[in-house]
């Protein structure tokens, strides 16, 4: 693998790219129109590697994961550079790493660090009723501190409460459905696609229109979870597994250790909001550091500084014992950082094609927008996917509805796009960043999570239930 990567890198460095380069700079639309569908093969290879290698060669995968990511990334970048020119390839590489990946991974890192310094302690026994309450609390938090923030805050208390359980994979799966995805649909803070809508003129509290849809889906999923978890709970009891219940005099009341870190989490949430508000309120913040035509805005730089400062101060002001009680390690964030840089790079052609040809799909009905946005958000980054169909809907010439910066979008169409992007991120481990984080943390704590395809079996089985009441 290393020799192959060395050869690919040498070819990229010494090949006469300028001879093959396309004349002049191509716009994203021109690139998307020109790119063939087979240019998405490295992206498909990346997804299949994530799905298959952990099943057939787990130890090899853990050791060589970075090399696999580098292989698929170069397999896209080299032909792309040869055909369209090294300058264009480098520009898109910088755009996806500096413009998208950097803020993405910094946000995850910050929330991961701060949440790891908060520990819910006390006697809390995991059973179906308690688990439903914990999932509901996390779901309601998701829209106000983000799906990633809520996931990182709630994952360890739920794992700790159910430590005695033997059958608990369903808890983690529904955790991803509810807290890591569906719960984030009520505000722009909840999930990045809605923040993108807010930046394009949709009112901050408009997403509250999704409350009835969210409540119905949450009710369906919590009912289904309660039935599944009750069955698993009874089997655990029948097999002789019981929670340790201490005498009344020895019980510890529920309390938060490291509670001051909630302030740092709120600072991170404020940083995300500011990154969306500042450029539209004060245009100077949309300017910034420019490299190869790609600008990292001052608003994004402020966001990054606030997040990293919060993470640093969180560690400096929190005792190590609290992290130890959470079994805190860096493995989960390291895995997400490695895999998602490959996903971001290899999905460049897929997003370019979607941006160029999305308007040609003939979408007019809300149900069409819901399903196409949702299906693509399951595998692509749901933020640009949302933006593509948001723009497509805005270009259809509607004369009434939700007013955006450029035009009107009917309320039910915007609801369909929003629900598709947010809800369907639950369909795969890569549909939304918290999904993979939850999976990694669960496995660190001894919970054997489903494989990539095994998880999809869970999600698609439930998909028929939680999408049936969505906008049409």
For each predicted feature, which ranges?
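Conserved small/polar residues in nucleotide/adenosyl-binding loops
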Residues: 466-471
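Interfacial loop-to-helix junctions that mark the boundaries of transmembrane helices
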Residues: 27-38, 60-67, 91-102, 204-212, ...
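Hydrophobic mid-bilayer segments of alpha-helices in multi-pass membrane transport proteins
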Residues: 39-50, 64-81, 101-110, 136, ...
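N-terminal secretory/membrane targeting signals
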Residues: 1-22
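Membrane-core helix-loop-helix motifs of multi-pass transport proteins
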Residues: 165-231, 237-262, 437-465
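Transmembrane alpha-helix boundary signature
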Residues: 79-96, 112-126, 144-152, 350-356
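Transmembrane helical segments that form the transport core of multi-pass membrane transport proteins
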Residues: 267-388, 392
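Membrane-interfacial helix-loop connectors
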Residues: 79-81, 142, 152-167, 171-173, ...
């Amino acid at each position: 693998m290393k020799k192959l990567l060395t050869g690919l890198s040498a070819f990229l460095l010494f090949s006469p790219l300028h001879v093959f380069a396309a004349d002049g700079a191509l716009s994203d639309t021109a690139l998307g129109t020109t790119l063939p569908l087979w240019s998405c093969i490295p992206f498909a290879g990346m997804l299949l590697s994530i799905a298959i290698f952990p099943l057939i060669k787990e130890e090899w995968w853990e050791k060589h994961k970075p090399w696999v990511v580098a292989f698929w990334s170069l397999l896209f970048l080299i032909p792309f550079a040869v055909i369209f020119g090294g300058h264009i390839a480098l520009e898109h590489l910088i755009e996806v790493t500096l413009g998208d990946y950097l803020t993405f991974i910094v946000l995850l890192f910050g929330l991961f660090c701060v949440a790891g310094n908060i520990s819910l302690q006390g006697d809390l026994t995991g059973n179906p009723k308690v688990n439903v309450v914990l999932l509901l609390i996390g779901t309601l938090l998701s829209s106000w501190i983000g799906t990633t923030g809520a996931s990182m805050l709630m994952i360890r208390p739920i794992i700790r409460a159910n430590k005695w359980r033997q059958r608990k994979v369903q808890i983690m799966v529904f955790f991803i459905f509810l807290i890591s995805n569906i719960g984030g649909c009520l505000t722009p803070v909840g999930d990045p696609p809605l923040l993108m809508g807010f930046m394009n003129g949709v009112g901050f509290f408009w997403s509250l229109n999704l409350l009835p849809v969210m409540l119905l889906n949450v009710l369906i999923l919590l009912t289904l979870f309660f039935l599944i978890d009750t069955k698993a709970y009874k089997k655990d009891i029948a097999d002789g597994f019981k929670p340790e219940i201490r005498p009344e005099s020895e019980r510890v009341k529920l309390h938060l250790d490291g509670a001051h870190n909630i302030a740092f989490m709120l600072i991170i949430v404020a940083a995300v909001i500011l990154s969306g508000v500042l450029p539209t309120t004060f245009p100077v913040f949309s300017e910034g550091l420019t490299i190869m035509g790609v600008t990292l805005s001052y608003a994004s730089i402020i966001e990054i500084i606030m997040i990293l400062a919060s993470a640093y101060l969180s560690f400096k002001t929190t005792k190590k014992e609290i992290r130890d009680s959470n079994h805190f390690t860096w493995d989960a964030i390291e895995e997400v950082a490695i895999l998602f840089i490959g996903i971001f790079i290899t999905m460049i052609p897929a997003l370019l094609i979607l941006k160029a040809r999305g308007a040609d799909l003939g979408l007019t009905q809300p149900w069409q927008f819901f399903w196409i946005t949702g299906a693509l958000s399951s595998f692509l980054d749901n933020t640009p996917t949302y933006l593509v169909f948001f723009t497509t809907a805005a270009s259809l010439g509607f004369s009434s509805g939700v007013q955006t910066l450029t035009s009107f979008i009917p309320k039910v169409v915007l609801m369909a796009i929003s629900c598709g992007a947010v809800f369907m991120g639950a369909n795969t481990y890569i549909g939304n960043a918290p999904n993979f984080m939850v999976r990694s943390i669960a496995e660190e704590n001894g919970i054997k999570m489903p494989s990539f395809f095994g998880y999809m079996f869970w999600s698609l089985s439930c998909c028929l239930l939680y999408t049936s009441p969505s906008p049409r």
